[in-house]
Amino acid sequence: MGHFTEEDKATITSLWGKVNVEDAGGETLGRLLVVYPWTQRFFDSFGNLSSASAIMGNPKVKAHGKKVLTSLGDAIKHLDDLKGTFAQLSELHCDKLHVDPENFKLLGNVLVTVLAIHFGKEFTPEVQASWQKMVTGVASALSSRYH
């Protein structure tokens, strides 16, 4: 799953403290649905997903994006036990929702893109490396039920 150094943890935690979970969550999930349209099939109940502007303005997309990033915030508090932290969510997404685990990787990559947009020069290659390690670890933890 990857080992987080103290520097990784400090880097991730420091940036996370500046993230607007509602804005970044909505943008991250919205971008996932626009860039990878096949992921929309898991969100049939969200109403109008017919265009990029409809998706980005959809209140259900924003609300679920916030929920996703809120759970990521919990993970940041437990970087040494991502698998345990996400055990229930992994079970839900695997057994009940049947989400393709590849989508977790895509979402993590979209989040890294959103953070880069929001934080600009502050999102250095070192910061990106720590965050990429984290989203990869989270994707792996969420996929653990599938193995």
UniProtKB/Swiss-Prot annotation:
Effect noted on mutating L106H: In TNCY; hemoglobin F-Brugine/Feldkirch; lowered affinity for oxygen
Gene of this entry: HBG2
Post-translational modifications reported in the UniProt record: Acetylation of Gly-2 converts Hb F to the minor Hb F1.
Effect of H147Y: In Onoda; O(2) affinity up
Keywords linked to the UniProt accession: Acetylation, Disease variant, Heme, Iron, Metal-binding, Oxygen transport, Phosphoprotein, S-nitrosylation, Transport
Residue(s) carrying N6-acetyllysine: K60, K83
Known outcome of mutating K105N: In Macedonia-II
Ranges in a coiled coil: none
Cellular component aspect of the GO annotation: blood microparticle; cytosol; haptoglobin-hemoglobin complex; hemoglobin complex
Natural source organism: Homo sapiens (Human)
Outcome of swapping D95N: In Columbus-Ga
Modified residues (Phosphothreonine): T13
Tissue: Red blood cells.
Residue(s) carrying S-nitrosocysteine: C94
Primary role: Gamma chains make up the fetal hemoglobin F, in combination with alpha chains.
Family of the protein in this entry: Belongs to the globin family.
Modified residues (Phosphoserine): S45, S51, S53, S140, S143, S144
Name this polypeptide is given: Hemoglobin subunit gamma-2
Organismal lineage: Eukaryota, Metazoa, Chordata, Craniata, Vertebrata
Effect of H64L: In TNCY; hemoglobin M-Circleville
Subunit structure and binding partners: Heterotetramer of two alpha chains and two gamma chains in fetal hemoglobin (Hb F).
Any single Pfam family the record assigns to this protein: Globin
Sequence positions bearing N-acetylglycine: G2
Gene Ontology terms: biological process: carbon dioxide transport; cellular oxidant detoxification; hydrogen peroxide catabolic process; oxygen transport
